[in-house]
Amino acid sequence: MDSQRELAEELRLYQSTLLQDGLKDLLDEKKFIDCTLKAGDKSLPCHRLILSACSPYFREYFLSEIDEAKKKEVVLDNVDPAILDLIIKYLYSASIDLNDGNVQDIFALASRFQIPSVFTVCVSYLQKRLAPGNCLAILRLGLLLDCPRLAISAREFVSDRFVQICKEEDFMQLSPQELISVISNDSLNVEKEEAVFEAVMKWVRTDKENRVKNLSEVFDCIRFRLMTEKYFKDHVEKDDIIKSNPDLQKKIKVLKDAFAGKLPEPSKNAAKTGAGEVNGDVGDEDLLPGYLNDIPRHGMFVKDLILLVNDTAAVAYDPTENECYLTALAEQIPRNHSSIVTQQNQIYVVGGLYVDEENKDQPLQSYFFQLDSIASEWVGLPPLPSARCLFGLGEVDDKIYVVAGKDLQTEASLDSVLCYDPVAAKWNEVKKLPIKVYGHNVISHKGMIYCLGGKTDDKKCTNRVFIFNPKKGDWKDLAPMKIPRSMFGVAVHKGKIVIAGGVTEDGLSASVEAFDLTTNKWDVMTEFPQERSSISLVSLAGSLYAIGGFAMIQLESKEFAPTEVNDIWKYEDDKKEWAGMLKEIRYASGASCLATRLNLFKLSKL
């Protein structure tokens, strides 16, 4: 049966190709031409049969009782001849040159003349090119041309990135109905409903005189019961526009009662008045007014998780529930990378080596990726200007800092510091570190970058600690660590910089120290249960975790060798001791570890 189907498909493709090529030849040679489409001062010869087969509009036109002369020359008003020419050629060749400059005009004309093949091609093109800068325009186009497939795709794109897109100027130009189509969506990616309210009120104030009259309808799409009662009292009740609107004051009264636990009786008439229609997926049993809707948005399922990134996948671990979730596949991520999460919860991976054959001057490059947690994929960014390893990563104001390390070509120790600006999408060099160092660690806290330990040019461990102020552009010494070390774990936990394990002049270490940022002093903490290097420390939701690393393990031959371990420990602050949580989590193998916030709604449980 399979061979018969394959043969039938092969014959169909052959016949389709033969027919398409034959039709194009007939058009090129102007054979059997029986009509002309006239747009402006240009006449385009074609065949009624082809137009009728591809367009219900033209089929009805040519089968109508219209005078024969009008069928021979069809005059099309308000049509760009260049766009029409592209569409006609597509009907004969199945090829069209779509670009950002012509796709909307082609889309509109295909919609007007009911040419589904061109229409579908345009929709697919626009869906693939959805971006923060054009998604609202594409949403508007989908609604205007009554194309649910495109409008829904654009709306979902906007919903996923609502916090970013609601700040754009295009958002402020949305019509009331366009705004409602966005904020009524259950899938809105907001952690707090307060963000929706603030976006709506900013939209109103952009054109207050005209938009106040639409506010009552838009108001129904905001899910006030998802807000804190304090925020509702301080910001919603006291808003001057809301206070001056009698209709909204009635709704405020109902909402105040709802916060007090008194809901109105559901009414079948609510749906008829439109008050319940904006809630999206509500049924007949949910006929309370829209502004009483308390269904959580999809973005409200965000949780603090430990992200483990290796060369296979990025996996999020929930230590409270002992569950793992697939965040993204990571086959392009190298093993020897470093990772960082910014204050804005943006996740970056830096490092690893590849050869850029087109760059003759500097063929060796280091990878640089950013995680798109919505699309669950890694986005390539401009590589490091100089390939290096054993460096430290810091972040201030969304800028990424790569501090010192080793040059991958010369193996020389480095003191240079590179800064990546995501707005300009460029790397720049900033103030050098006072010493050349590698195998150190870097941590950021409250707008400052701290560089700790590592090995210097003489291959000896250092205990020096530096602080970098990006606004002043200078490095300063802080109190040194008690034990010089490299390849250790670091985290900011409860206002202190905690370091654990690492390599010292005597070998692997289990010692743990804490640096008090207010007193500039180091204190000894409870030792980790095992001497380790490359251990990862993560402070998550008030708890400190230690993950993996390398320990000296006795082999069957009775010899000791550095071996990777993939366990998880938790520091119990009240008992001042380390407690084992997981003996092995395989996703930690070769992984960098981060404390981050991710939306469980969009993740797949492993």
From Swiss-Prot:
Keywords: Cell projection, Cytoplasm, Cytoskeleton, Disease variant, Endoplasmic reticulum, Kelch repeat, Membrane, Nemaline myopathy, Phosphoprotein, Repeat, Sarcoplasmic reticulum, Ubl conjugation. Residues 33-100 form the BTB domain. One of its GO terms (molecular function) is ubiquitin-like ligase-substrate adaptor activity. It comes from the Eukaryota. Ubiquitinated by E3 ubiquitin ligase complex formed by CUL3 and RBX1 and probably targeted for proteasome-independent degradation. Quinone-induced oxidative stress increases its ubiquitination. GO terms for cellular component: Cul3-RING ubiquitin ligase complex; cytoplasm; cytoskeleton; cytosol; endoplasmic reticulum membrane; M band; nucleoplasm; plasma membrane. The modification Phosphoserine is found at residue 3. Kelch repeats lie at residues 346-398, 399-447, 448-495, 497-542, 544-599. Residues 135-237 form the BACK domain. Sarcomeric muscle. One of its GO terms (biological process) is protein ubiquitination. It is linked to Nemaline myopathy 9: An autosomal recessive form of nemaline myopathy. Nemaline myopathies are muscular disorders characterized by muscle weakness of varying severity and onset, and abnormal thread-like or rod-shaped structures in muscle fibers on histologic examination. NEM9 phenotype is highly variable, ranging from death in infancy due to lack of antigravity movements, to slowly progressive distal muscle weakness with preserved ambulation later in childhood. Involved in skeletal muscle development and differentiation. Regulates proliferation and differentiation of myoblasts and plays a role in myofibril assembly by promoting lateral fusion of adjacent thin fibrils into mature, wide myofibrils. Required for pseudopod elongation in transformed cells. This is Kelch-like protein 41. It comes from Homo sapiens (Human). The gene is KLHL41.
